[in-house]
Amino acid sequence: MSKENFETFIDFGSSKIRIAVFDNYYSKIKFFSEKECLSTFNLENINLTNSKKIIEELIQISEKKIGIHINSVNLMIDTPDLFSIDLSIKKNLEGKKINNNDIKYLLQEAKQLVQNNNFDKKIIHTIIEKFVLDDKIFYTIPEGNPECNYLTLEIKFICFSNIIFNQLSEHLKENHISIENLLCSSYIKSLNYNQLFEKYDKKVFIDIGYRKSSLSIFDKNRLILFNIIPLGGNHITKDISQVLGISEEDSESIKKSLNQTESIFSDDSKKEFISNSKIKNKLKQNISLDLLKKVIHARIDEILNLSLKNINFSSLINDKNKCILVFTGEGSKILDKNSIYLENKFNFFREMNFFEESVSTICQSGYNFNKKNYLYEVNIVSKKLKKNGFFEKLFHFFN
């Protein structure tokens, strides 16, 4: 098979790097793998030192499995400084019928406004939330080219640091790899997982990563809110380390033990899930598990409260029975297995779900995103369309 028959996705996380190669002919995954690797994407301290060898190993393993050289990838990534911008832009049509060129014009104007005021950022996703024709709201392009005085588009842009992007590009070039597309990992994952909960009208996804957490809220298939905060599972590890007076490595071991236990999180169950005798002795000497629970719960509370800050759920959620809260990400595992109870805090949801992710489900989200023409998404990043103008890059949105 030729290179064009395969598509490669790398999910570049702060604690793990995942790779998956998809066979376009059969539309299925051909090979996937992952390796642990600590990287820092903070603008003040970008550290990709450990990842070069890991990426090289993952690429080489993948190439051996598929028998073809890989020279470009779709890069899935989240960073603590990634953010979204909501913008509303209007055009006076003077009672004329709307057409695609009017919409394209407004999209171009909006993109230019965002770019001019955020010159150090790269727009990686553009989502049209609403089409407003005078006082009528539409969530898809109105059929029949109706007449109106004013056409308004409400648009969400997800932006990424140019500095980090350029460093990632140079970093991958050292392995002779170019970036085909840059994708916000937490956004496209929630977009894909959203389809698994179709019986619910309102779906709230909280993805707790290593150094960041993200929030995505959907009204059926429509994204209505996206946000990222610079707090994640590693902050829980550091809290445990400070309170217990042990290394972060030992703290991470305790946290992983809690992730795996089915027992109730209390002093009585201490022997059941802490197998490391060194850590167990330190716990006996320094702190009770009940206090440890409070430390962890305090940080989890902070992550959740900051994620859900300024959201009026009483107006957002009008029917509890049709709402679900879904936790994803490595950092959310500590909430599962009866370790910590959150039901009382989120009693306006009918159900809470701890979605078990894997390399295949994560990278499949990227593949599905590239293959499906999501109704609200405008693709302005594709490298394959680099020579075309902005309007041409919207062809799939209007066809």
Range-by-range predicted roles:
Residues 64-68, 80, 157, 165, ...:
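Phosphate-binding glycine-rich/basic clefts of nucleotide- and phosphate-handling proteins
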Residues 309-326, 333-351:
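ATP-binding/phosphotransfer module of carbohydrate and carboxylate kinases, centering on a glycine-rich
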Residues 195, 202, 206, 215, ...:
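Conserved mixed alpha/beta catalytic, RNA-binding, or beta-rich assembly cores of soluble enzyme
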Residues 341-369:
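Conserved phosphate-binding/catalytic loops in two-lobed NTP-binding clefts
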Residues 1-16, 20, 24-72, 77-203, ...:
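Nucleotide/phosphate-binding catalytic cleft detector across ATP-hydrolyzing
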Residues 21, 215-217:
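Conserved blade-register residue in beta-propeller folds
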Residues 15-16, 210-214:
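Short acidic, Gly/Ser-rich segments with clustered Asp/Glu that frequently serve as metal-coordination loops
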